[in-house]
Amino acid sequence: MAVPRNRHSNARKNIRRSHHAKKACSGAVCNNCKQVFIPHTVCASCGFYKGKAVVTVEK
């Protein structure tokens, strides 16, 4: 079995994990209502997805 030879310091561990942070999600613009929404999801303001009405939104 693989066993670490020496202990890694907290600084070295944190430097290694510096790229593990969650990235901010880029927004896409809805073609129907021009609102910003999360890509690959239904627009929350109008209910359209890829140019088609998928969900009826109550206003």
From Swiss-Prot:
Keywords: Ribonucleoprotein, Ribosomal protein. The keyword Ribosomal protein applies. The keyword Magnesium does not apply. It comes from the Bacteria. GO terms for molecular function: structural constituent of ribosome. GO terms for biological process: translation. InterPro entries: Ribosomal_bL32, Ribosomal_bL32_bact, Ribosomal_zn-bd. GO terms for cellular component: large ribosomal subunit. Residues 1-20 are annotated as: Disordered. SUPFAM superfamilies: Zn-binding ribosomal proteins. Pfam families: Ribosomal_L32p. Belongs to the bacterial ribosomal protein bL32 family. This is Large ribosomal subunit protein bL32. It comes from Chlamydia muridarum (strain MoPn / Nigg).
